[in-house]
Amino acid sequence: MIVTTTQSIQGHEIREYKGLVSGEVIFGLNFVKDIFASVRDFIGGRSNTYEKAMIDGREQAQREMEQRARAMGANAIVGVSYGYETVGPNGSMLLISISGTAVVIE
């Protein structure tokens, strides 16, 4: 499945628009890991805990979106965008969302 942020796919013609598809993931991080990540962030280092969680979450949300597109009969998704938001008490959870338009290409 081709997934792109652009509205078209070079070398392919869009034959049919199937509709909007999305994938969402929400998760909280371990309390102890949060403390160490906060300390690392405070002293200026990178938080590998949060970076890995964001990468894993983004990949999971994209897989979910692709599955939904396949179920609609699509073989590509165009106009993809990601969103990130902290939710829950004290921003303790991260919501990652992805959406795009499911299409059939030649």
PLM region spans:
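Short, well-ordered alpha-helical segments
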Residues: 21, 31-81
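N-terminal presequence-like segments and the immediate start of the first folded domain
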Residues: 1-33, 71-75, 86-88, 92-106
